[in-house]
Structures are given as C-alpha cells and as structure tokens.
Amino acid sequence: MKKITLLLGMALTFVLTSCSLIFGNKMTEKDGINEAKEILEKEQPFAGKEFYKVRLHTGKPLEDAFKGVTAVFKDPENEGKYISQAYWKIGKLQNPQEDSVSDNLTPFKVEEIDTDMVVKDAAELYKFLENNEELKDFNRFNVRDMTIIKWK
C-alpha cells in the first residue's frame, strides 16, 4: 500500500511540476516574461533590434499562459519603416506589417525590460481591481495582453 501511495504521490508531483510545460508559463509571472524576452533576444528578425513596443499575448480570453509576443521595431531593410511582427510559441512567425509609433516613445533593448517591475505592476493592477468597489466585476479576470513601452 505504501508503494502505491508513493507512486501516486510521485505521479501527482510530476503532473504539478509539468503543468507549466503543458499549459505554459503565466504571462504575468517572471517565467512568462523571461520566455518572451528569450524569444526577442534569440529569434530572427528580433535579435539585436531596438523595440518601440513589445506586446505579450495569451492567445485566447480567459487564459493566462504566455503564448506569443509582438514587437514593433524600425526595419532598416524596409526603408526604415516601423514594422510590427508577431511570434507565436507554436513556432509560427507571422508576416510583418507596417505600423506607426507615437513621437512620445523611445526605443529600448530587451535587456532594459525589468522583469520584476512588470510582475510587480501586474500584481498591483490585480490588487487595485480587487479593492475598488466600482470595478469589482473585473475581479478575478485574466490579463490577455500586456504592452511594454518606454516613454521619452
């Protein structure tokens, strides 16, 4: 009986530790944000670029697992136009699209994204919604998209 309980416990532990592999890392937690940063650092056409906007996505409403990232950057190969390009974890790089950028934004590198600050801001947003009586209907919602920008 002890052996069965031990095996069941080990199986349950495996399932719990594998959940992030099955469902993905939460977008509003450090692992999800670091996963997005890794894509932007290593995958083409993002590697080495400066970004004006970085959007993290879950993919569907009511999900909170990180599924993809969209970045807006200036593309020297495309006459210096602003390009928006998405990368989804299922391995699909979307076609680039022309985009526009506000004059109030300044470009930034991936290493400038403060993961701890993004996680803290997301936690503060949840707490604000939890504690605000007028917004109580939004309590227990999931963040579907997050945009990271740098103001001038």
Give the predicted meaning of each segment:
Residues V15-S18:
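C-terminal motif of bacterial Sec signal peptides marking the signal peptidase cleavage site
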Residues F51-V54, E133-M146:
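Surface-exposed patches in mature extracellular/periplasmic domains of secreted proteins
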Residues L6-A11:
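Sec-dependent N-terminal signal peptides
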Residues S20-I22:
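Bacterial signal peptide processing site
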Residues I90-N139:
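Long, charged/polar, surface-exposed segments that mediate recognition or autoinhibition
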Residues M1-I4:
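Positively charged n-region of N-terminal signal peptides that target proteins for export
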Residues A47-K81, T147-K152:
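Exposed beta-strand-loop-beta-strand "reactive/processing" segments of non-cytosolic proteins
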Residues E29-F46:
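Post-signal peptide N-terminal segment of mature Sec-exported envelope proteins
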